[in-house]
């Protein structure tokens, strides 16, 4: 399971011109399930995200988590994180989980996130989405659970 985590001042996801998910300060999480991923990987990814200390404390050091600041999580499915371009210029997505399994793992992750954190918004799995964000920093962290 892979994720790109961006610290944001705000973020939202629109589908067909309608906002379907939005947060203020917090984390935008672009999430990708890969072949062979399991629920335990999603659990570890969520635990890492909730405790990741990438928000500034009073001294300006990255020492606070999204939980510490009461921030939001905006979780967006992003199968293209599984792209492989080693064989040419056109990406291959064969490492991405099959659509049914990808959806199941995404839904599992979102369900667990909502149980663990009070502010969780989402995009829509498999939809054509427009993601709008105000990157804070910018701070962008790639995560991978194996």
UniProtKB/Swiss-Prot annotation:
GO terms for biological process: D-amino acid catabolic process. GO terms for cellular component: cytoplasm. InterPro entries: Daa-tRNA_deacyls_DTD, DTD-like_sf. Pfam families: Tyr_Deacylase. Keywords: Cytoplasm, Hydrolase, RNA-binding, tRNA-binding. One of its GO terms (molecular function) is D-tyrosyl-tRNA(Tyr) deacylase activity. Its EC number is 3.1.1.96. Belongs to the DTD family. Homodimer. This is D-aminoacyl-tRNA deacylase. It comes from Variovorax paradoxus (strain S110). The gene is dtd.
């Amino acid at each position: 399971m892979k994720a790109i985590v961006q610290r944001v001042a705000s973020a939202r996801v629109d589908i067909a011109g309608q906002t379907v998910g939005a947060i203020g300060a917090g984390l935008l999480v672009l999430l990708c399930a890969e072949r062979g991923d399991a629920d335990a990987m999603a659990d570890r990814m969520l635990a890492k995200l909730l405790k990741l200390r990438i928000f500034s404390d009073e001294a300006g050091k990255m020492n606070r988590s999204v939980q510490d600041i009461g921030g939001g999580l905006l979780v967006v499915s992003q199968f293209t994180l599984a792209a492989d371009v080693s064989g040419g210029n056109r990406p291959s997505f064969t490492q991405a989980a099959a659509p049914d399994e990808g959806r199941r793992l995404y839904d599992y992750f979102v369900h667990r996130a909502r149980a663990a954190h009070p502010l969780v918004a989402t995009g829509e799995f498999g939809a054509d989405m427009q993601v709008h964000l105000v990157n804070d920093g910018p701070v962008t962290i790639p995560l991978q659970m194996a």
